[in-house]
From Swiss-Prot:
<dbReference type="InterPro" id="IPR006171">
    <property type="entry name" value="TOPRIM_dom"/>
</dbReference>
<dbReference type="Pfam" id="PF02132">
    <property type="entry name" value="RecR_ZnF"/>
</dbReference>
<keyword id="KW-0863">Zinc-finger</keyword>
<dbReference type="GO" id="GO:0003677">
    <property type="term" value="F:DNA binding"/>
</dbReference>
<dbReference type="GO" id="GO:0008270">
    <property type="term" value="F:zinc ion binding"/>
</dbReference>
<dbReference type="InterPro" id="IPR023627">
    <property type="entry name" value="Rcmb_RecR"/>
</dbReference>
<dbReference type="InterPro" id="IPR034137">
    <property type="entry name" value="TOPRIM_RecR"/>
</dbReference>
<keyword id="KW-0479">Metal-binding</keyword>
<feature type="domain" description="Toprim">
    <location>
        <begin position="81"/>
        <end position="176"/>
    </location>
</feature>
<dbReference type="Pfam" id="PF21176">
    <property type="entry name" value="RecR_HhH"/>
</dbReference>
<dbReference type="Pfam" id="PF13662">
    <property type="entry name" value="Toprim_4"/>
</dbReference>
<dbReference type="GO" id="GO:0006281">
    <property type="term" value="P:DNA repair"/>
</dbReference>
<comment type="function">
    <text>May play a role in DNA repair. It seems to be involved in an RecBC-independent recombinational process of DNA repair. It may act with RecF and RecO.</text>
</comment>
<keyword id="KW-0862">Zinc</keyword>
<protein>
    <recommendedName>
        <fullName>Recombination protein RecR</fullName>
    </recommendedName>
</protein>
<keyword id="KW-0234">DNA repair</keyword>
<keyword id="KW-0227">DNA damage</keyword>
Amino acid sequence: MKFSPLVDELIQSLRALPGVGPKSAQRMAFQLLERERKVGLKLADSLQKAMSEVGHCQSCRTFTEQDLCPICSSHRRINTGIICVVETPADVLAIEAGGHFNGRYFVLLGHLSPLDGVGPEELGLALLERHLTSNEVSELILATNPTVEGDATAHFIADMARRHNVVISRIAHGVPVGGELEYVDSTTLALSFNGRIPL
């Protein structure tokens, strides 16, 4: 059933979000229109501001309203000499939430995927190489996803970084804390056994 053109447009716009199907989009639209008009207006205002004012950090490519994000503006972070390479800004948030990393990041905004037209240029690897030649970087931690594309991307970046006398490491992959072995896939188990450490 079709509603008014504006309601249909709102539902279709909400469907553009990842994981939102037609029923979920319809429920969200009706909730905003029936009960949450103030929330809807605030959402529209926040979305408009974010779309017009949020860009990418000129150093690491994560989201920011400034030329440099707060992490890249921190002398404490710069002085560590460590850059962690991740695929998305969401990866930065996940690592920051853990509170165990105090260096800087470089966000690829994807991974190598020649079939999709994503090569080194699209990932900003020229900018990453400029960081490596600046003598400010002593270690590069590769934290790409444990997928075929993520591994290929990590190997490509490692080959590039070796030319600059930088220590290169890859984050460990394995069984999650609190996970039960019977539910872990065979590839993850293999990585866990291969990456085991002495006690």
